[in-house]
Amino acid sequence: MPVTGFDIALRRPLAGGRAFGAAGPYEELKGRLRFAVDPAHPANRAITDVELAPRNARGRVEFAADVSILLPVDLHRCRGRILLDVVNRGNAVAVPNLNHATRPVFGPGSDPNPPIDPGDGWLMGRGFVIVSCGWQCDVPEIPGLLRLRAPEARGRDGSPLRGRVYTQLQAAEAVPHFFLSDRGHIPYPAADLDEPDAVLLARDLPDAEPEAIPRSRWRFARLEDGRVVADPRYVWLQGGFAKGRLFQIAYTAVGAPILGFGMVALRDSVAWLKHSASAEGNPAPGVLRWAYAYGRSQTGRLLRTMIHLDLNRDEAGRRALDGVIVNVAGGMRGEFNDRFGQNSKDRPHMMRHLEPFQIEPRERLKVMLTNTSAEYHRGDGSLIHTDPDGARDVAHGPDVRVYHFAGTEHGLGNWPPTDRVASPADPAGWIERSQNIRGVVNYGRLLRACLVNLDRWAAEGVEPPPSRHPRVEDGSAVPPEALAKMFDRIPGSRYPRHHALPQRQDFSNLPPEPGRAYGSLVSAVDEDGNELAGIALPEVAVPLATHTGWNLRHPDIGGTEQLLLFAGSMIPFPRTWREREAAGDPRLSIEERYRSREEYLARVRQAAVALAQEGYLLEEDVELSVTFAARLWDHLTDPSSTR
């Protein structure tokens, strides 16, 4: 068994010993899993540079991962299900997303072991054992984040490797220097501070012609107390970096940790829980049979990469995962198995790993691909179900479902409505401001239904609801520019004049050479600007506003022609017909649509019940949908509220 030990550093009751329905009280175990894997085993051969890893006396490669496990105190009350929470940049995401809970924010000086907010306890009430496993060796050096401690690849003479790195840097305010990484991650240090072939580019749009910044104007350095101090982890620019501009740097770095062991840690941690005995440190021996993974955004892309590399069977040939929910990953994978890869890189125009966009697991792994409108307007969302040119639909196999959550943004909505949101998982604490109010629709209810349907599909053979997404054949998938005419009629909608679509690129040299754009498509919209395709939650199906998957950057943070990546918009309907007439808004006002709050909520309930009957929503979440809609009604009909 590749897991050689579990060192428990913290054991405590969850939520003060609160009982979660039939599963009873839970406890949290937090510590470190130790691994020793055979680098020559076929199960590990897909790992880049595995042959260059240092080995112990038994010829094994050792590494370790931080782990948090939530499980019932009485294991007899466990339903035999594991949910692998594929942590995002060191942060747990499954409980916050599926339980409507608050995720702790880790930063310098924060408590590394804050109490876990269980939210409404939904996952625990269903008896899931939830394991959160660190898989990144480059997460910011902040206590509390779950990380991987992986070995570095070495040359035949034992020296550290050198290689080319290409990364993008952008700030919400003017800065004198940048850390050479995304969101404070541990960077690859420059091998030569004076490297003449290092390149720094600046762009105003992701696909615009770059401006090459003369080498004499920038250095590998940081500004400290007014002095420029040489530092291989930073880049400094004479005159500073302007807010909102996109800066891309290509340079030679030194020191390459073996990133692919992160996927091995995920696989083997699940296999250990499913198959090992208590003598091997398993806290739940003999009770866990089915395992599912939830990954969102970055970690959804990681799951896509694991499936692509066929990394789901351990050294004993045993299947780890039985099903996965790949949420808001669009059509991308990532540099999760690359020499000098960057785990946090997440912009499609910076990615070498795009094609193939479709996923077909090589074994009977059940896969649900869920995306919001933001991934479609980002440009890669539609490519998981069309050909690369966007000319025709491409069908998936029987073990895959594709769901588009209409009118939603990348995150699970923002409440109360605002145009200012903290940049996700960013230790710098940047506040991202948008030109429109951000999206408010919380699609966590749809994810809960996906997990229940995934479990029934894998464990009982019950088919889940059919895929639902924009399609070329019925005209519901259209180029993004096709929406401009509609939105230009809505006062103050600020529809983007330019969508920077993903391009075919030659990454044999860095910076890469761009080529032809992919055929990216988005959902067509109705006369209110709401999307016609996908799964529409009641707040979208019975609307009080136009809900979109796009929003532009605000002048306060620069780059005003760029999409604020991941952001959606809420564009409220006028309250009254008088407001509508005064504004010249073609959309009916709230008072023209609904005679009263009671009528509106009755229609919301009807839409929620219909969605539950189709299987896309759980019956238990019908009333939650009504509650969310009532909150939105009260806000948008209050004359004193900010719209």
Residue spans for each PLM region:
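C-terminal His-loop and adjacent cap/lid subdomain of alpha/beta-hydrolase
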Residues: 2-643
